[in-house]
Amino acid sequence: MYAVFQSGGKQHRVSEGQTVRLEKLDIATGEAVEFDLVLMVANGEEIKIGVPYVDGGKIKAEVVAHGRGEKVKIVKFRRRKHYRKQAGHRQWFTDVKITGISA
């Protein structure tokens, strides 16, 4: 059984027991979280596709950890003008473990 849900402006395909890295959620580590923006649920041959969301579709998960991703370097440069700028960015994330899928 697997499902596709929406979180943080992105879509994720998950199955039970899987750990997924999402955009930062303001929920403490170890707490349960429930996602109700389920786009699709598949159980063997039976597939439910939402318009846009599946009625009664829920994904239960547990927050495992919070952290920051790898640094991305941003460089602005203009040739012959002695103009260079550098910046860096590290995006916050939340790791969640999927504990249940229902539709």
Swiss-Prot record:
Protein family membership: Belongs to the bacterial ribosomal protein bL21 family.
Role played: This protein binds to 23S rRNA in the presence of protein L20.
TM region positions: none
InterPro entries tied to this protein: bL21-like (IPR028909), bL21-like_sf (IPR036164), Ribosomal_bL21 (IPR001787), Ribosomal_bL21_CS (IPR018258)
Record-level GO cellular component terms: cytoplasm; ribonucleoprotein complex; ribosome
Keywords of this entry: Ribonucleoprotein, Ribosomal protein, RNA-binding, rRNA-binding
The organism of origin for this protein: Pectobacterium atrosepticum (strain SCRI 1043 / ATCC BAA-672) (Erwinia carotovora subsp. atroseptica)
PROSITE patterns attached to this UniProt entry: RIBOSOMAL_L21
Listed name of the protein: Large ribosomal subunit protein bL21
Subunit structure: Part of the 50S ribosomal subunit. Contacts protein L20.
GO biological process terms held by the UniProt record: translation
GO molecular function, one term: rRNA binding
Family matches, as NCBIfam families: L21 (TIGR00061)
